[in-house]
Each structure stands twice: as structure tokens, then as C-alpha cells.
Curated annotation (Swiss-Prot):
Subunit structure: The complex is composed of six subunits: RnfA, RnfB, RnfC, RnfD, RnfE and RnfG.
The protein, known as: Ion-translocating oxidoreductase complex subunit A
Gene Ontology CC entries for this record: plasma membrane
Organism taxonomic ancestry: Bacteria, Pseudomonadati, Pseudomonadota, Gammaproteobacteria, Alteromonadales
Coiled coil: none
Membrane-spanning residues: 5-25, 39-59, 72-92, 102-122, 134-154, 171-191
Signal peptide: none
E.C. designation(s): 7.-.-.-
Species in which this protein is naturally found: Shewanella amazonensis (strain ATCC BAA-1098 / SB2B)
Name of the gene this protein is made from: rnfA
Length: 192
């Protein structure tokens, strides 16, 4: 039980996919302008990442590995991710049209979010079992969501602040992301 908790904490805080592994930077910078969009993107990404992680494990374990088709791993994982994203987009469109409009192009772009594919491939490389794959996917999603929501709140606060002209926009966003990354480095010794 403690092994699973350590995996979850390690994935969320210590090995955060955005701040440590630099995966998922496109939606991190693109959707973080408004807190409402960041929360919606976080929920959608959490759902997609967790489900894609589990389904990718199943595809690898019961389809690719037994038939020695591991060379198709990346392509099959991308297909699984695309199906999960399409399902999520239909679900969001039916349940919340305003959220669907707010997310705009970023919802279909979850398909190309390298963090989603990275989690699926790292699950295979680290030889996680089914439960570990689910926890790893969920932890990566929670870590992504945590960083995205915190960063979005900071960007909204910075938009109201008196930032010098050369630092406005992307420059102050990159400085803020760097400071967040330094703050998350404090968790490094938490999990071995």
C-alpha cells in the first residue's frame, strides 16, 4: 500500500511531468491565461491521462506483447489516446457547452499532448502492472492539473500587477514557470 502512495506522491510532486520532465508544456502555456479554462483543461486531461494510461497498458499487455508487435507501440498508443480524447470531447460537449467553447482547440490538442503519450510509454518502460499504471497515470494527471491551476492563478494575478513593459506576457510567464520549477525542486528528497 505504501508503495502505491509513494508512486502517487512521486509522480505528482517529485517527478512532475511539466516542471521536471518538461512534458505537456503547450497546454501549460496555452490554457493558463484564465483560471476557468485551466480548471476545465485539468479535468479533461485528468480523465484522458488516467484512462489512456490504463487502456495503453491493456493494449500493450494483451495485444502487442503476446503477438510480438511491440514495434507498433507508439502508433497504437497514439490511436488509443485519440479515441479517448474523442470520447472526452463528446462527453464535454454534451455536459457543458460553455466549457467546450472555453477549451476551444485545446481539447482536441490533448491528442498531441506529449505528456499523455509520455505516461503511456513510461508505464511500459518502467514495467508497471495494471494498478501501478492507473496510479501513475492519475498521479501524472493530478501533477499536471496542480501545476496548471497554480500557474493560471499566478498569471491572472500578474495580469493585474504592474509588470514592467519588457516583461509583460510570455516573458513574465516563463519567469514564473521557472520559479515554480525551482519551488518543486524542494520535493526532490521526498521520495527515493
Amino acid at each position: 500500500m505504501s508503495e502505491y502512495l509513494l508512486l502517487l506522491i512521486g509522480t505528482v510532486l517529485v517527478n512532475n511531468f511539466v516542471l521536471v520532465k518538461f512534458l505537456g508544456l503547450c497546454p501549460f502555456m496555452g490554457v493558463s491565461g484564465k483560471l476557468e479554462s485551466a480548471i476545465g483543461m485539468s479535468m479533461a486531461t485528468t480523465f484522458v491521462l488516467t484512462l489512456a494510461s490504463v487502456l495503453s497498458f491493456l493494449v500493450n499487455q494483451y495485444l502487442l506483447a503476446p503477438f510480438d508487435l511491440t514495434y507498433l507501440r507508439t502508433m497504437s498508443f497514439i490511436l488509443v489516446i485519440a479515441v479517448v480524447v474523442q470520447f472526452t470531447e463528446m462527453l464535454v460537449q454534451k455536459t457543458s457547452a460553455s466549457l467546450h467553447r472555453a477549451l476551444g482547440i485545446y481539447l482536441p490538442l490533448i491528442t498531441t499532448n506529449c505528456a499523455v503519450l509520455g505516461v503511456a510509454l513510461l508505464n511500459v518502460n518502467e514495467q508497471h502492472d495494471f494498478l501501478e499504471s492507473a496510479i501513475y497515470g492519475f498521479g501524472a494527471a493530478v501533477g499536471f492539473s496542480l501545476v496548471l491551476i497554480l500557474f493560471s492563478a499566478m498569471r491572472e494575478r500578474l495580469a493585474a500587477a504592474d509588470v514592467p513593459m519588457p516583461f509583460r506576457g510570455g516573458a513574465i510567464a516563463m519567469i514564473t514557470a521557472g520559479l515554480m520549477s525551482l519551488a518543486f525542486m524542494g520535493f526532490t528528497g521526498l521520495v527515493k
